[in-house]
Amino acid sequence: MDMAKKGFLSLEMVKILESEPINEKELLQGISTGKIVILSNKHNLNHPVGLGDGLKSKILCNTGTSTESSSFAEIFEIVKEAEKYGASILCDQSSGLKFMEYRKELLSTTSLPIASIPLYQNAEEALRVNGDPIKFHSKDILKTFKEQINQGISSPGIHPITKNLIKEIESSSRLMPYVSRGGTIMSAWIKRTNMENPYIQNFDKILDICAKNDVPLTFVCSTRAGCLADGFDDVQISEWKLIGDLVEKAHKKNVGVIVDGIGHLRIDKIPQAVEKLKNLTHNIPIGVMGPAITDRSLGYEHISHVIGATIAIFNGANYCQACCRTEHIGLPEPKDVIEALRAYKIALHGADLAKIPGLQNLDNQISKARCKNEWGRQLDLAIEPYIAKETFQRVGPKNPEKKGCSICGVLCPFKIIDTPKEVY
């Protein structure tokens, strides 16, 4: 942010300009005001990712060890597929054993930026050493935060829950008071110790660490709704206001900020919720987890979430977490991650088409090829060429050199309109 304010372009900024529909002046202005943030893998600076208004929307894919399953082989299979099928950012949400070993290997394996939630490491260590995930010391919070940045994390996430927010949650009529894992861990710690959130108490130190390492900070909403009944309620808005105040402090220290919020939400509330979050947090890049548009989509959560994501992105969100069909049930397998990413790529492209001038060029090209029945070009221009070609082999026309697909056959509109008069 400091470089952008001085009008200088970094190597990462130059690479962003090569891949995004934005000019140098707009990029520098966006970064200097906090409306655009750049994430980089500190071990591989060749693939920086820009988040913010005027840029293409991005997909974040969660990964990491779990207390239920810590198979490195399966986790790295998911990482490989995530990178292959369109994820722009990985988020290490490790809460199982060997997280340090896993993160080191992850950082050297992928070229994607890696976000994290350091609090999960504190909880796992407390559980392993003390038999209680809440039994950690406030000084451990800052130590782990700094440790993960030094290891190469691109953007650490913190939960800004406070004593006042906890009171508001517990006096509210929420159907599901707590659903954020990190928010709940920190809330339980605050209630047990009667101390304020160490992230808030040490916020200036947190910002100094981020500024020194040129790493943006992510706020992970502690009060996000876990059901439609609680979506976009006063509790959540109170947290957004707090985040807005903290964003101002961060920007004064030249620290870029991202906010990750909005869970379950009815379709009619998504536009106003995104607008509210953007306004309260000074138009910084925002991400959404879904939003899930129904609480009843068990087994098909990727569909529910991708519908919500399309609406949220079109209305101003900048990235979304890829939720799989296994959400709310269990850990995804690689095939679930691939399925989700394919759906999100289509959804986000559709939303970006309506927001960013010039992106429709490839859609126009495939339409021209379709009109001419140029099958090879159509298949190559598809968002997922491999799937398009596999589908063509399975159900496409027997004689592709003849016009028409296998749906209309000889009644193909493109064929009929070109038929010479003498045929009749």
Where are these regions (language model features)?
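Alpha/beta enzyme core
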Residues: 2-300, 305-319, 393-395, 399, ...
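Residue-level detector of alpha-helical segments with a strong bias toward transmembrane helices
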Residues: 17, 44, 326, 419-420
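Catalytic or ion-coupling anion/metal-binding cores of large enzyme and transporter domains
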Residues: 168-193, 225-231, 255, 331-424
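C-terminal catalytic subdomain
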Residues: 296-299, 304-305, 312-357
